[in-house]
A protein has these predicted regions:
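Transmembrane core module of solute transporters
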Residues: 1-101, 105-111, 115, 131
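Short, intrinsically disordered/low-complexity patches at protein termini
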Residues: 5, 61, 80-81, 154-155, ...
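Transmembrane helix-loop junctions in multipass membrane proteins, especially transporters and channels
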Residues: 12, 45, 49, 75-79, ...
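Hydrophobic transmembrane architecture of multi-pass small-molecule transporters
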Residues: 15, 24, 125-242, 253, ...
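Selective for proline/serine-rich intrinsically disordered segments
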Residues: 29, 39, 97, 107, ...
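Residue-level signal for alpha-helical transmembrane segments in multi-pass membrane proteins
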Residues: 42, 69-73, 138-139, 239-249
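Intrinsically disordered terminal tails
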Residues: 115, 256-257
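Hydrophobic alpha-helical segments of secondary membrane carriers
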Residues: 119-123
Length: 269
């Protein structure tokens, strides 16, 4: 969702052509990667020493706070505020991921750690796939409330016939959203060269410029962002509560050690 925010709105508003936005969106997201790369190893070392529960739970709190900050950020934001929040998002993710994995692996006997690792990876990948579907559904629901009327009014204002404007506005919002993500001017794509050629030169220039579509999309897109980041923050809080209730760390003994204790008469408990 952050990539769409950058590619579809922020980068065009700041002078980047649509065919350059995929590259620059990735570059501007590097603070998140850096935050994860720094916090992951550090939190892993600290969790080995002090336990996983506190650090992993703190990670979910940082993660949730970053989503709240992104909710409060204007659509046309200052980059340094955005970079700080996505870095916090990466830091929180790293603080949770490493201790949580350690806690899972430390809660099963040594002979079962391969199975535990496989199940952890399966649930993580499944959760990622499901979350993508949920997030885009929430975003489209938010866009659908105001994008059609906003888009129709903007097109009519620049001379597009009302019938054509309403036809474009009635298309699924996902078509407008993903056209910009693919590095294509959405308005040029949606109207087509035939209709554009019938408009005055000034109208063509504004419609196909870098700022028309992002300016129209700001308010509808923000409505979707509020829903997406609000749900994400709430789920992060629930994850924090679940993390807080985890048991104390215990590293099960190896099968050889268990057999040795049994032979010596020492109970397992």
């Amino acid at each position: 969702m952050l990539i769409i925010w950058l590619q579809g709105i922020w980068l065009p508003l700041h002078g980047y052509s649509y065919d350059q936005t995929p590259l620059w969106a990735g570059i501007f997201m590097l603070p998140m990667t850096a935050g994860f790369l720094v916090s992951g190893p550090v939190s892993g070392i600290l969790s080995d020493r002090f336990g996983s529960r506190g650090i992993a739970t703190a990670g979910t709190a940082v993660f949730a706070s970053s989503f709240v900050g992104l909710m409060l950020l204007p659509v046309n934001f200052s980059y340094w505020a955005f970079a700080t929040l996505v870095a916090l998002n990466g830091i929180g993710s790293g603080m949770f991921a490493s201790p949580n994995s350690s806690s899972i692996m430390g809660s099963v006997p040594a002979r079962d750690r391969g199975s535990a690792s496989g199940m952890r990876a399966t649930f993580q990948n499944s959760g990622t796939a499901v979350s993508i579907g949920v997030v885009f559904t929430l975003m489209i629901a938010g866009l659908s409330r105001s994008l059609p009327s906003t888009l129709s009014d903007g097109l009519i204002r620049l001379g597009v016939p009302a019938g054509a404007a309403h036809g474009v506005a009635s298309l699924p919002p996902v078509s407008s959203l993903f056209a910009s993500v693919l590095g294509v001017n959405p308005i040029e794509h949606l109207l087509g060269p035939g209709l554009l050629s019938q408009l005055p030169a000034s109208g063509q220039a504004e419609l196909t410029g870098r700022t028309f579509f992002p300016s129209l999309l700001q308010i509808p897109f923000h409505n979707g962002l509020i829903i997406v980041f609000g749900v994400s923050a709430g789920l992060s809080v629930l994850a924090g509560l679940a993390s807080l209730l985890r048991g104390k760390r215990s590293v099960p003994a190896s099968p050889e050690a268990s057999e040795s204790r049994l032979e010596s008469g020492v109970p397992r408990g």
